[in-house]
Amino acid sequence: MKINLERLCRRLNYHFNNIAYLKQALTHCSAGSDNYERFEFLGDSILSFVIANELFNRFPLHSEGQLSRLRSFLVKGEMLAEIAREIDLGDYLFLGQGELRSGGFRRTSILADALEAILAAIYLDGGMIAAKQIILMLYSSRLDDPDLNHCLKDAKTQLQEFLQASKFALPEYVLTKIEGDEHAQIFHVTCTIEGVSQVAYGTGPNRRKAEQLAAKAMLEQLQG
């Protein structure tokens, strides 16, 4: 296991002074009481701060809302798991037998949590400067991506642009049902496109939210 940890350190481009921090950051709760749950809590805050600070400096003309959406996009679980897979993090996790048999080393939530825990371990071992350097290294391609601001567009706008680029008809949103009490209504919307077989659905506390969710579902279907 020592060789594996050394290999992971090379992938992270970081040498631990206290390897115990890394071992705990890699230990799932199914594998023992000295697990990564507390590290995950700390790592989540460290990551959020570093990304927020970087976005604040990179995009001086963005509003608070735009910066918040960019940060949410970059620190969401799916993004963390994607980065974790790039460094083969699942190969180094300490899992209980049940989690191991069920493929926990591939699970998005576990990979995301473990990556946050590792960031906390680096912070505890080497301080904030070290943690920031590693975070920016891991995120460099995403922060430099010219399409990063694409996530600022809402789902209906993204779907419309995709359809126009693909020479499809524009989507139609139909309110199919409203249920619940007046103060807690649920709106149901169907999204269809002429000439396209797929149908998407969205539900939300208002029509606008339901349409956005239906558009998001349709875009995911079309993009596969």
Curated annotation (Swiss-Prot):
Its EC number is 3.1.26.3. Its cofactor is Mg(2+). GO terms for cellular component: cytoplasm. InterPro entries: dsRBD_dom, RNase_III, RNase_III_dom, RNase_III_sf. It is found in: Cytoplasm. It comes from the Bacteria. It catalyses: Endonucleolytic cleavage to 5'-phosphomonoester. Keywords: Cytoplasm, Endonuclease, Hydrolase, Magnesium, Metal-binding, mRNA processing, Nuclease, RNA-binding, rRNA processing, rRNA-binding, tRNA processing. CDD domains: DSRM_RNAse_III_family, RIBOc. Residues 154-224 form the DRBM domain. Its main location: cytoplasm. Mg(2+) binds at residues 40, 113, 116. Digests double-stranded RNA. Involved in the processing of primary rRNA transcript to yield the immediate precursors to the large and small rRNAs (23S and 16S). Processes some mRNAs, and tRNAs when they are encoded in the rRNA operon. Processes pre-crRNA and tracrRNA of type II CRISPR loci if present in the organism. This is Ribonuclease 3. It comes from Legionella pneumophila subsp. pneumophila (strain Philadelphia 1 / ATCC 33152 / DSM 7513).
